[in-house]
């Protein structure tokens, strides 16, 4: 499972999402090694209760990369959840995370208002499907509390490899 950064229906030129050519290169390496590759995430930025993840896969270029390279997209908003008891309460994470043999986290190099720089850690927040992310943001309103939530998600998800896309960094 390639866990990309798919914040919303953004093109790669915005530097808001993992660059699709970066994802393509990693997908090719894995497909050459006979791996079944999934490209997955749940977008942020839900408006009026509608998550834009499906549209985000198209606009970002991930849908095209998956089709051209023999991978599958996994829209975490539509794949179901698994409830996990954690030190910060019960968390509901996307089911593909528990079905994948191996998780590669592909964050985007960018800053974030909740922590200045979050590196690979913040990207796994997208493992929380759909509108549930807003509730976690609300329940952890300051950087210290939000950081604790991110740490727990990273413990549970346990990505085996983190490779950051720094093709174009984003600030703000």
Where are these regions (language model features)?
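N-terminal and secondary-structure boundary signal
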Residues: 1-172
